[in-house]
Amino acid sequence: MAEYKKIVLLKGLESMEDYQFRTVKSLLRKELKLTKKLQEDYDRIQLADWMEDKFPKYAGLDKLIKVCEHIKDLKDLAKKLKTEKAKVQKKKQGKCKTAVKKKGQDELSSSESLFINKESYKSVPSSKKKGKAIAKTEGEKKNKLTQDQDHLPETSGTDIKTEEDCLQNSPKPPPTSPSSSSNKKKRKEITKTEGGKKKKLTQEQAQLPEPLGTDIKKDEDCLQTPPKPPPTPPSSSLNKKRKSRREEETGVKKSKAAKEPDQPPCCEEPTARCQSPILHSSSSASSNIPSATNQKPQPQNQNIPRGAVLHSEPLTVMVLTATDPFEYESPEHEVKNMFHATVATVSQYFHVKVFNINLKEKFTKKNFIIISNYFESKGILEINETSSVLKADPDQMIEVPNNIIRNANASPKICDIQKGTSGAVFYGVFTLHKKKVKTQNTSYEIKDGSGSIEVEGSGQWHNINCKEGDKLHLFCFHLKRERGQPKLVCGDHSFVKIKVTKAGKKKEASTVLSSTKNEEENNYPKDGIKVEMPDYHV
């Protein structure tokens, strides 16, 4: 995925002019779920990080190509991005084929080695193996058996064949014939006189009669046919050697058969690995939000909105602000408590809804905390009872740039709020221009240098104690349009913090002074108060 991100950032976003870049951000705003604030603040690097998190397969390259194709000045750039993407895919396919070919060659060489070992084992004459077993006998018995072999040269092969037939057909083998023992002694003598394996093999082949070799070959074929080797009597060294060879051949077959079923998956594994997209999870402070590739099933919690994404990766942040806890009505119509906070990483800031008021002490200004198992919805983080919030160690602290802190404390312009889409969430501090109390709700008109907009407060935000000129700090208010006119309305998690200003105090003081003056005029006569003094006589 790193190759695709390089294309998006270095050959895509960096090649655009500022106006073109702002156009691309505007067209991708809904797909990337960018708030108006994030849309304005994001630079090319931050947008590339965000696209990588939202579209992990190709780091958002397909989305960027699609948008560029609809912009007249960026059509050539779209073709260039397609070409670069094709180069990366071709390169990856070549690596996959090379890996599969190399894997197949390794397995083929191992199979050939196994086959050669088996064939070389078969090519060794049975007389050589039997000669080794015969070489162990000692003493006078050797000489006696050697003399007996001169009388029966023609029947040795027949006797060996008969012996093998008996081994296959009867549960107990017959005793070894003298001719078989004489053959053993004959091979033993050849072994002693020659001293080398090659010379010994040559003389054995020369002295043994032809029927003997034929019968031994048939004997080998017969030994491979039965499912179980025949029982070996302790007195027969020849039968022991045949049984040993039979077991070794069976073991080779089993080991080869056990390896063969595993070969196709081994060859296919590199191909599947190359075709599957590699998903990366960003847990560093420079990234925006850890990727949703590490998402877990969302626990059943009524505070979590539909479409929220669970992030289990830890994220280190610095606390900028936090409100006091306040009550809100849950979807189960229960009264619960929560508070709002603002946190920041090294690259951006986040508004946070905290539904566990036991964490209030940790959300102290300039505290460094590590959050995990939290949710993200519309760019706002949500922390509940299942989330983890830990205090960061000194070596885990981060340095938040001043421009990030300034952007977090800044309020959006009202003209920008009016241009927003319905359902967008806004935070900020605004001056109260007018207040109109109605039966069901209260209309608060806020104003700044760019324009004015109505804020509709209901429920606990109906007719709050504020005066014209006061500052209203709005948290989590939603944009709504009625008859084409935009206005901000409160939701379940909305909160208002009132900051009384000097203008508001002066307004209130002048109102009180005016009402006092009217009261005095109404209660006191114009001619003043006439007081009669009693006469005192001494």
Curated annotation (Swiss-Prot):
Phosphoprotein in keyword set: no
Coiled coil: none
Outcome following mutation: residue 339 to L: In strain: BALB/cAn
Bilayer-spanning residue ranges: none
UniProt-listed CDD domains: Pyrin
Induction (free text): By interferon-alpha and interferon-beta.
Region (Disordered): 120-306
Record-level GO BP terms: activation of innate immune response; cellular response to interferon-beta; negative regulation of cell growth
Entries under InterPro entries matching the protein: DAPIN (IPR004020), DEATH-like_dom_sf (IPR011029), HIN-200 (IPR040205), HIN200/IF120x (IPR004021), NA-bd_OB-fold (IPR012340)
Subcellular location: Nucleus
Effect upon mutating residue 483 to S: In strain: BALB/cAn
GO annotation, cellular component aspect: nucleus
Keywords, in A-Z order: Growth regulation, Nucleus
UniProt note on tissues of expression: Highest expression observed in spleen and thymus with moderate levels in bone marrow, lung, skin and heart, low levels in muscle, liver and intestine and little or no expression in brain and pancreas.
Result of altering residue 496 to I: In strain: BALB/cAn
Name under which the protein is recorded: Myeloid cell nuclear differentiation antigen-like protein
Species this chain originates from: Mus musculus
Gene behind the chain: Mndal
